[in-house]
């Protein structure tokens, strides 16, 4: 388990929260970010789960993350609301400006110079993170 230096107030977050991590390099003046250049044994894995009870970050292996279709971190065809008797579908969404506390860019990324830093901003940095939350979806079908 890793320490959480990123999310300070997680009391109002949903139960299912994932943190996506990437490292970047600058090539010919353009920043390029990818999870493939995360440094082993230095950086966290590409995905971490937030334990909303104590705020710790739990590493997720690549085998846990099964599908990246439509930019969702987990396969949605089998995802259901946990502990619910109904079979309500849920979707993963990027958390955008949670309670106006975070300085993020238009795609939900926060940037910093390293992952252990407590200061994250909407631009400039060697590493970046974004938060995914799983929320129930409503059906608006015409029956």
From Swiss-Prot:
The keyword Transport does not apply. Its main location: cytoplasm. It is a peripheral membrane protein. The keyword Transport does not apply. Changing residue 123 to A: In Spo73AAA; disrupts localization to the prospore membrane. GO terms for biological process: ascospore formation; ascospore wall assembly; ascospore-type prospore membrane formation. It is found in: Cytoplasm; Prospore membrane. Keywords: Cytoplasm, Membrane, Sporulation. It comes from the Eukaryota. Coiled coil: none annotated. GO terms for cellular component: cytosol; prospore membrane. Interacts with SPO71. Belongs to the SPO73 family. Required for spore wall assembly and ascus formation. Involved in the formation and elongation of prospore membranes. This is Sporulation-specific protein 73. It comes from Saccharomyces cerevisiae (strain ATCC 204508 / S288c). The gene is SPO73.
């Amino acid at each position: 388990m890793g320490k959480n230096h990123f999310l300070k107030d997680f009391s109002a977050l949903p139960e299912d929260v994932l943190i996506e991590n990437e490292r970047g390099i600058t090539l010919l003046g353009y920043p390029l970010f990818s999870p493939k250049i995360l440094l082993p044994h230095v950086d966290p894995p590409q995905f971490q789960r937030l334990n909303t009870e104590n705020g710790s970050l739990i590493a997720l292996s690549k085998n846990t993350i099964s599908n990246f279709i439509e930019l969702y971190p987990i396969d949605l065809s089998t995802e259901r609301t946990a502990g619910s008797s109904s079979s309500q579908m849920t979707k993963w969404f990027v958390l955008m400006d949670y309670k106006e506390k975070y300085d993020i860019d238009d795609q939900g990324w926060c940037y910093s110079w390293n992952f252990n830093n407590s200061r994250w901003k909407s631009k400039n940095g060697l590493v970046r993170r974004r938060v995914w939350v799983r929320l129930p979806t409503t059906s608006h079908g015409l029956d």
